[in-house]
């Protein structure tokens, strides 16, 4: 598809879709696009109902609606899709709002006022007979728009399915459970806490899941329908040890597993690389991941040790 624009009302006279300028400009741009390439449909992202929106929807071939999961309210014979949706807020590895560090929980339970959680959006579009699907804002976190803190030292957005380093947040596994046919199950959060009742969520595409704490079953849950039901919630009284999630097929066979261990005191660093060899060429680049682990090799999720890196034969660039 060729897009004529996104939320263009903000750049037009009057600043909204009631401006007559918007339809004339979009008609002109649509004609120009069709003259250059008539083989692909045109679209645009609209973020407000009312005004000349009906006229705009008649100009393009495919109607893009931003942040309105209930697109049944739009009266048009054109195909409809979510051109920008969700804007859920989360920080990788954080499981409660952390005001001091300006971080949001990795549970899928917070979104901007005009958006929705990831699960809410997915469920809405799965249940819609009108929509072709939706684009999520955003796949990656990015520098800028640190909504809703919007002040120093926050400098990165919180919308991403993965963070700015490319590491998946927990919500990544919800999407995986929806669109990947390979059996999987994912536990959140980590299992290194002090005490109390912990909200444990599982994402899985298996027919059923079962959670174990130190070998004791905490119950089996069955997939009732595709959608947000791919998320399973437990409340678990914390006890140090091993948390295991099993995923089973319809016949009860174990086909997927995820394990979280309680970490001990930080004892060592573990490095891994995205390449097996590095060229001496000046433009070669390698990404090194560093994990803080206890003596048994378990990731220490709460470690805040100060680490200094030095490189011989290369340069640290970020």
Language-model-detected regions and their locations in the chain:
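Extended substrate-binding grooves/exosites of carbohydrate-active enzymes
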Residues: 1-225, 231-238, 242-254
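Short, well-ordered beta-strand segments
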Residues: 159, 210, 216-218, 303-317
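Short, solvent-exposed loop/linker segments at the N-terminal edge
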Residues: 191-196, 277-286
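Beta-strand-rich structural segments
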Residues: 202-203, 246, 283-300
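Short aromatic-acidic-glycine turn motif
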Residues: 221-223, 266-271, 309-318
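Extracellular Ig-like/FN3 beta-sandwich strand-entry sites
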Residues: 238-242, 283-285, 304
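Edge beta-strands of extracellular beta-sandwich domains
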Residues: 252-264
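Low-complexity, acidic Ser/Thr/Pro/Gly-rich terminal tails and inter-domain linkers that flank the onset
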Residues: 263-281
